[in-house]
Each structure stands twice: as C-alpha cells, then as structure tokens.
Amino acid sequence: MKKATLVGIVFVLMVVGSASRWTALAQEATKPDSAEIKQLLDKTKAIAGSDWSETFDFFCAMNPTRANRPDDPVIEPAKVLDNLYVIGRTSTAVWAITTSAGIVLIDAGYGDQLESVLLPGMKKLGLDPAQVKYVIVGHGHADHFGGAAYFQQRGARVVVAGPDWDLIEKSPAGPVQPPKRDVVAVEGQPITIGDVAFTPVMIPGHTPGSMGLVFPVKDGRTTRIAGIFGGSILTPGRLTNDGMKQYIESVNHWAEVTKRMKVDVEIQNHPMYDNFLTKLDRLKQRKPGQPNPFVVGADSYQRFLGVMSGCTTVQLMRRA
C-alpha cells in the first residue's frame, strides 16, 4: 500500500471517529431535562419576567453556541447617559466615560478595527481619541484589548487584572500588538480618574482575571451607578465543570457587590443578551422626561444576575 493512501485512510478514520465522538456528545447534551432541571428553569424564567426574557433565552438555551463575531453589524455610536457613550458592534461594545481628567475607555475592541469602527465612532460622538487617558480591559482576550496598545503608545494608561496581564503576555504572536504591562487592578481598590472612581471586582471564570467595574454616571441631575460584568461566558461548552462552578461563584459575588453598591444601570461588553439593541432603539426615540432605558433599577439589575446564575447552573446540571 502506498504511503499516501495509508495516510488518507488514517485521516478518514480520524474524521469519522471525531464526528462520531461529537455526535455522541451532542446526543448526550440534548437529552431531556430532568425534573430538577425543569424546576430550576421555571424558577429562573419567573425571575427573568418579561424584561429579561432575552437573557433567559440566551443563557438557558440547550447547547448554546452563539459567540461574538468580528463581522457582526456595527452599531450607531450612541450617547447613553450624560457622560457614558457606546461604540462598536452588536456583540462587542466599547464604552467611553468622560471625566474631568479626560476619557476612559472600558475595553478597546478589535485591534484591526480601530480605523474602521472605534476611532470614527468616537469622532462621530464628539469624543477626541487624543483625550483617552485610561483603557480598562474587562478581560484579556484580543477582542477587548485589541486597540489598547494604540492608546498606550499615545500616553494612555492600561488597566488589567494581574492574571490577565499574564494571559495577554502569553498570547500567541499575531497582527494585533498587545499593550505592555501597566496598571494592575485589585479587587475593591478604586481607580480614580478625575471625578469618576471605578471599582474593580474580580470575576474569574471566562478568564483567570476577568473583571467587573462599578462606577457613577450622570443622568441629568441624578447620579446613577453603572455596572459592567466584563467576563461573560457566551459558550459554556468551552469550560470544564470546575470552571463553570467558579463562574457561578463569580456571578454571585458580583451580585453581592452590586447590590451593596446599588447598581441600577446595566451595560455589557458583549451585549448579546440584555436587550441592548431594543434599549438603543428606545433611547433614540426617547422624548424629554421619559426614563432612560439603560437605567433598569437596582432590583431589576439583581434579577438580571439571578437569570445569569440560574441559567449557568442549569447548563452545569445538564452535564450530569
């Protein structure tokens, strides 16, 4: 038998074996939910109500596989609150906060989309990229730190949690230059830029150094408290059981902190499951005196997190 033929047979056997293995896993993963799981689903759906039904459908889906893509539609850049802006794509958002000391970015998007998405989006909102003083990265993946080096080279500081600085430095070489190690975020130690203090909360699971942020925002004469959970798991199949358990603990820890700090504005860096597009549309049509759709209220925010925690627990139970 010729060597090429033998290699071809081995390759076919590997493909068939791999396909069979994935088929078996899929069949196992789609087995009917147990009575216990159905009970938790019903409880979580009740927590979701109508306002967080999108969150429930996304996270409690059987075999969720929808992740963000770099070619998802670009959103119309928007001023969400008096000092809070959003730029990016429907699945990967960059948030800009104006302070008395300059602009702070939460994440910096894809590195190869600076000139096509982030910078023109900022300019459309009247935000000068040269005034970016800090970039705070929610977690150490390239769709979040991609543009950070650009701003760092122009004088901005870059903030990442310690474990994710390690992750960034170990990232394989590619076309996107990562930022150089700079400020290390620490749980509960505020990062104050001008008149705004950002409180980091460690939420490991998606990455070892995933981080949430709590900070004040302006809503007319009212000060609101915004929260961004910077390490959402979109496709739980990528995590081990221990990783899922750690993530659930992180969501619950985040819930405790945000309840104590009275977070009432909900935003995400992967806004695929929180009515983001609906809220942007309502914001665009909002008339003077009408409530801001991003101000969800403290109780509603906790229900949102209850759905995240409940659905992730469901996904873990489905593996048993």
Residue ranges and their predicted role:
Residues Q113, G140-G146, D166-I168, P208-M211, ...:
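Active-site environment of divalent metal-dependent phosphoester hydrolases
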Residues K31-D42, A46-A48, D112-S116, P120-P190, ...:
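Active-site HxH/HxHxD metal-binding segment of metal-dependent hydrolases
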Residues V15, A24-P70, G220-T223, G231-A320:
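Accessory terminal helices/loops
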Residues M1-A4:
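Positively charged n-region of N-terminal signal peptides that target proteins for export
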Residues P70-L125, P129, G212-L234:
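Conserved beta-strand hairpin/beta-sheet module of binuclear metal-dependent hydrolase folds
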Residues G8-R21:
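Bacterial N-terminal signal peptides
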